[in-house]
């Protein structure tokens, strides 16, 4: 399909997951998780500083973005509010773009990230335009 993005190499993924799990993190990946994420129109979801839902064979961008989100929860950047969630999404997209070379993101992932950044920035503008409610 046209929206196909290359999965993160297995060795790299296993190394990152091992480190996260050694700090008490939980990564949920299964057919059921894929179905749930599909119903939410999401590639991945971070619930808190320790819990990530990832679709099977995730892209590098998905994996790194979710780890950025766990850190945002850990540092209190994300308080769960709509506004805070949008600000965290924007910060995560910017970080992915800034470190795209280090993360070895593909051109397609960078383009998708730039699109997502624009969408989140527009959503936040709308939120403020409507009085922040």
Language-model features: where?
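Catalytic toxin/effector domains delivered as secreted proteins or via bacterial secretion systems
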Residues: 1-133
